[in-house]
Curated annotation (Swiss-Prot):
The keyword Magnesium is annotated on this UniProt entry: yes
Protein name (Swiss-Prot/TrEMBL): Carbamoyl phosphate synthase large chain
CDD domains reported for this sequence: MGS_CPS_II
Region (Carboxyphosphate synthetic domain): 1-401
NCBIfam families given in the database record: CPSaseII_lrg, PRK05294.1, PRK12815.1
Organism field: Enterococcus faecalis (strain ATCC 700802 / V583)
Length: 1060
């Protein structure tokens, strides 16, 4: 059926900020969909609150609204734009839930807006646990025995009837939020209570556990003519019981017989047809390893994390085609853009193995609960492609950037057998490494299979890797064994360790013996038809399919997996850099390992290498392509860390040179540069031991900020108040040494702000100054940022601009740089300089209209800023006020303290813009999911040193009609100042109503909790209070500056009511 002509204007809903369970895959899907609709001639309106995405760039849609995805704001935009139709299936769970809410509010009927893609009834049938169960019964598709419950007691009664273990799955939540596996009644009560609270419809499905079955996924597409195909099927390495987003996954499936494959394929197609979904859909199934019995676990009636993986694994652009299906096109009418000859109804075939490994944030949250279950915890993922499982898996392991170049972690050699067994049975994020260690110790794969229920086939592949290790050890310098190791994904570094040689020696020996990788094309059809996609992976075979062009090329290094501290902002900068390289007439080549992002869409660059970002893998591409140089400024710390080793290999780094990068990162050189430029910085020094740190701190005075050198996202950074805490930090948080010194700085309390600048060696363009709402001490990525500055005097702004210019020219910066300042007692100090793109680039680019990464790339390639139409100094400010607010994923990460400090904890960001600061703040809070009631109770639990300041805030809350509740010390203090306050007891002293009861019973609408600097039981109480607030979805502020910002909003919305 040809595309519809009765609709002209379509609204697309994005997925909002990046959180665990909903990451960059929706930026990729949404960008593809908007462009596909524009290609077909429709007018596109986009609503998304996330400024860090390519999707919210002006050119992606005809009308781009960076506004909160809430009923209030989306309704307003619908009334203003009057679209004919709405496409919600590309905005993840956020988009689906918003569509349901809009429909229930009646506005879609009122404005006559049609829902495209998937009907509401289908969303309901797939998402509402009860309706889904009924549909499966009608289709005679088996589902685990289960019951829908609305209370904890109903859940307990069902469990008593069918026995434990059982699984709790809340309705309409994302990434398994609030769900979990229960072995006892006590666990069930706790998880069911939490799950019912987090489900927007207070409904959970309690089902018999089928943990241990094989977990299989099918990614399917259907059109309005009822054509349906399987794009890709995938098999989880981990059996049922671990969320698929936290599982290692292989595509295509590896252990299914043809009969099993066809049986599950038929079931998946039957389901998508019954739901009448038009577009993409993901079906998850559980297969009994000992029979042909299977169960349908769940269906996602939308584009998902798995469809991004399936798109990158096959090259088949699911989101693009789903958008076109939504407007009436059919699979047999659309060409597959990969081959350009076959039609989209042709099922992709793979002649390689794809593996995906999740990337977890536990390097940031050492105290976080690492056990994996049905609730997702990974922030991102990596993908690798190889000719066999071993090669694919080992390439994925080294893509993770966790310091592992092979499936082993050195520290596991000290673990006892008992501990090893425990960690394999109760899976954590590092189970793969424990399994490998067990095989090295001589456990049989049959033993491991009975402990973990992982298929013998996969365990045998791990065994094969370890057999090759043994062969390498006993055959040093043997070319045949070396070749076998390389064909199975071994890194030069691992072989070097086994042969007692250097990595360079192995690389030289390998090249001397003609053992070099070739690059194969990802073509969706297993080479059955000719195809010309510029999308490649490496393998050790004979024929190379990547032809080097005559045109000079530039290699851009991507930023790898999404993790805390290095998010989608860096992918945004990478994509823009590529556009500028192409515009300058060069061939742009991207290397990256993240399947979720826009940068790894093969249509973005001239050539895409889907490879790990390690020195060996990058050098292999450089050896083949011979680019004029490499750009490292846009790939975060991942790319910057490769600058020095690449330079040593004779590779040209474009932009700021490695010597100048080092002057910004190396403490002594940086101090020297600042002294020469006469720019002040907080007093401090470098310590190579704990004793030295104490001496420095005594000299400059407490509090001090301590951190290791060369970090991103403030890893292991702390503010320390006294000598005992400093010794404690030096012992536990860092291993100081002459090679890895620790920086000890005087901690200056003051207003913090930051600047992004672009320099071409002569002119310094400063797009804007961003002022942080939280004082120095909260990581810049976790602070709310305001542009243009609201409280900085013209004089201070001039000083900041002057220092920025001096630094950019003094450090010979070419390209981007980011500088953070603190204003202490009316003096400007430099805290740090990052000679690369920072996470604020997309935010500032959107509001100033300067495509910063493109302009910086042009400067890197030798163009002058004045020729591009830019002047020296600060760019004129915009009329509106823009607020960038962080978004956290604490509900998914148990046992993590939500207190904000110098170590970054947020996973995403939103933006609020308006002509008044208060309105922009309101939008930012709304967009970040903090919905503020206009009345209710505020719970205060305040550390002694901030009580005076908190008093002012309490007075203002009281003045606009809030009641005050506080823990003992705080309540006495407020009462002494004549404020009406209700006192509650501490946790450690449970007489009467405790502070936790107040939160649990819904008697606090806002919680303000500051941390006592001298760590005692007060802090343990504080931790419990903060966790309780997060788990009950109550707005929590750990900084009085943020509370002050909230008050501004509430006061601006409050009216005075007084009797005459």
């Amino acid at each position: 059926m040809p595309k519809r002509t009765d609709i002209k204007k379509i609204m697309v809903i994005g997925s909002g900020p990046i959180i665990i369970g909903q990451a960059a895959e929706f930026d990729y899907a949404g960008t593809q969909a908007c462009l596909a609709l524009k290609e077909e001639g429709y007018e596109v309106v986009l609503v998304n609150s996330n400024p860090a995405t390519i999707m919210t760039d002006k050119e992606i849609a005809d009308h781009v609204y960076i506004e909160p995805i809430t009923l209030e704001f989306v309704s307003r935009i619908l009334r203003k734009e009057r679209p004919d139709a709405l496409l919600p299936t590309l905005g993840g769970q956020t988009g689906l839930n918003m569509a349901m809410e809009l429909s229930e509010s009646g506005i879609l009927d009122e404005l006559n807006v049609e829902l495209l893609g998937t009907k509401l009834s289908a969303i309901d049938q797939a998402e509402d646990r009860d309706l889904f169960k009924q549909l499966m019964e009608e289709l005679e598709q088996p589902i685990p025995e289960s019951e829908i419950v609305n209370t904890v007691e109903q859940a307990v009664a069902f469990a008593k009837r069918i026995g434990y273990p059982i699984i709790v799955r809340p309705a309409f939540t994302l990434g398994g939020t609030g769900g979990g596996m229960c072995d006892t009644e006590e666990e069930l009560r706790q998880i069911a209570e939490n799950g019912l609270k987090l489900s927007p419809v207070t409904q959970c499905l309690i089902e018999k556990s089928i943990a241990g079955f094989k977990e299989i996924e099918y990614e399917v597409m259907r059109d309005s003519a009822d054509n349906a195909i399987v794009v890709c099927n995938m098999e989880n390495f981990d059996p049922v019981g671990i969320h698929t987003g936290d599982s290692i996954v292989f595509a295509p499936s590896q252990t299914l017989s043809d009969y099993e494959y066809q049986m599950l394929r038929d079931a998946s197609l039957k389901i998508i047809r019954a739901l009448k979904i038009e577009g993409g859909c993901n079906v998850q199934l559980a297969l009994d390893p000992h029979s042909f019995n299977y169960y349908v676990i769940e269906v996602n009636p939308r584009v998902s994390r798995s469809s991004a993986l399936a798109s990158k694994a096959t090259g088949y652009p699911i989101a693009k085609l789903a958008a076109k299906i939504a407007v009436g096109l059919t699979l047999d009418e659309m060409k597959n853009p990969v081959t350009g000859t076959t039609y989209a109804e042709f099922e992709p075939a793979l002649d390689y193995v794809v593996s995906k490994i999740p990337r977890w944030p536990f390097d940031k949250f050492e105290k976080g609960a690492r056990e994996l279950g049905t609730q997702m915890k990974a922030t991102g993922e990596v993908m690798a492609i190889g000719r066999n499982i071993e090669e694919s898996l080992l390439k994925a392991v080294r893509s993770l950037e966790i310091g592992a170049y092979h499936n082993e972690l050195a520290e596991l050699s000290h673990v006892s057998d008992l501990e090893l067994t425990k960690k394999m049975v109760h899976a954590q994020d590092d189970r793969l490494f424990y399994l490998s260690e067990a095989i090295r110790r001589g456990y049989s794969i049959e033993e491991l299979q009975s402990l973990t229920k992982i298929d013998l086939f996969f365990l045998d592949k791990l065994l094969h890797i370890i057999e090759i290790e043994t062969a390498l050890e006993s055959h040093v310098d043997n070319v045949a064994v070396l070749k076998e190791a390389k064909q199975n994904g071994f890194s030069d570094r691992k072989i070097a360790a086994l042969w007692g040689q250097t990595e360079q020696a192995i690389a030289d020996f390998r090249r001397a013996n003609q053992i070099v990788p070739v690059y194969k094309m990802v073509d969706t059809c297993a080479a059955e038809f000719e195809s010309h996609t510029p999308y490649f992976y490496s393998t050790y075979e004979v024929e190379n399919e990547s032809n080097v062009s005559k045109k000079p090329s530039v290699l851009v290094l991507g930023s790898g997996p999404i993790r805390i501290g290095q998010g989608v902002e860096f992918d945004y900068a990478t994509v823009h850099s590529v556009k500028a390289i192409q515009a300058a007439g060069y061939e742009a080549i991207i290397m990256n390992s993240n399947p979720e992002t826009v940068s790894t869409d093969f249509s973005v660059s001239d050539k895409l290498y889907f490879e790990p970002l390690t020195l060996e893998d990058v050098m292999n591409v450089i050896d083949l392509e011979n680019p004029i140089g490499v750009i490292v400024q846009f790939g975060g710390q991942t790319a910057i860390n490769l600058a020095e080793p690449l330079t040593k290999q004779g590779v040209k780094i474009l932009g700021t040179t490695i010597e100048d990068l080092d002057r910004a990162e190396n403490r002594d050189l940086f101090e020297q540069a600042l002294q020469e430029l006469a720019i002040p910085q907080p007093p401090g020094d470098t310590a190579t031991s704990a004793e030295e740190a104490v001496v420095i701190a005594d000299r400059i005075g407490y509090p001090v900020l301590v951190r290791p050198s060369y970090v991103l996202g403030g890893r292991a950074m702390e503010i320390v108040e006294n000598q005992k805490d400093l010794e404690d930090y030096m012992r536990h948080a860092v291993k100081a040494s002459p090679e890895h010194p620790v920086l000890v700085d005087s901690y200056l309390l003051g207003q913090e702000c930051e600047v992004d600048a672009i320099c071409d060696g002569e002119t310094v363009l400063i797009p804007g100054i961003m002022e942080h709402i939280e004082r120095a001490g909260v990581h810049s990525g976790d602070s709310m940022a305001v542009y243009p500055p609201q409280y900085l005097s013209q004089e201070i702004q001039a000083t900041i601009a002057d220092y920025t210019k001096k630094l950019a020219l003094g450090l010979n910066c070419v390209g981007m740089m980011n500088i953070q300042f603190v204003i202490h007692e009316n003096r400007v100090y430099v805290i740090e300089v990052n000679p690369r793109a920072s996470r604020t680039v997309p935010f500032l680019s959107k509001i100033t209209g300067i495509p910063m990464a493109q302009v910086a790339t042009k400067a890197i390639l030798g163009e002058k800023l004045t020729d591009l139409g830019y002047q020296d100094g600060l760019y004129p400010e915009s009329k509106q006020v823009h607020v960038k607010a962080p978004v956290f994923s604490f509900t998914k990460l148990q046992k993590v303290d939500t207190y904000l400090g110098p170590e970054m904890k947020s996973t995403g960001e939103v933006m609020g813009s308006d002509y008044y600061l208060e309105k922009a703040l309101y939008k930012a809070f709304e967009a970040s999911g903090l919905h503020l009631p206009s009345y209710g109770a505020v719970l205060f639990t305040i550390a002694d040193e901030t009580k005076e300041e908190a008093l002012e805030i309490a007075k203002r809350f009281s003045a606009i009609g809030y009641s005050l509740v506080a823990t003992e010390g705080t309540a006495d203090f407020l009462a002494k100042h004549q404020l009406p306050v209700k006192k509650v007891t501490k946790i450690s002293n449970p007489e009467g109503e405790t502070v936790l009861d107040v939160i649990r019973n819904g008697n606090a609408q806002v919680v303000i909790s500051t941390m006592d600097k001298n760590r005692s039981s007060a802090n343990q109480d504080g931790f419990s209070i903060r966790r309780e607030a997060v788990e009950h979805g109550i707005p929590l502020f750990t900084s009085l500056d943020t509370a002050n910002a909230i008050l501004k909003v509430l006061e601006s919305r409050a009216f005075t009511t007084e009797a005459i």
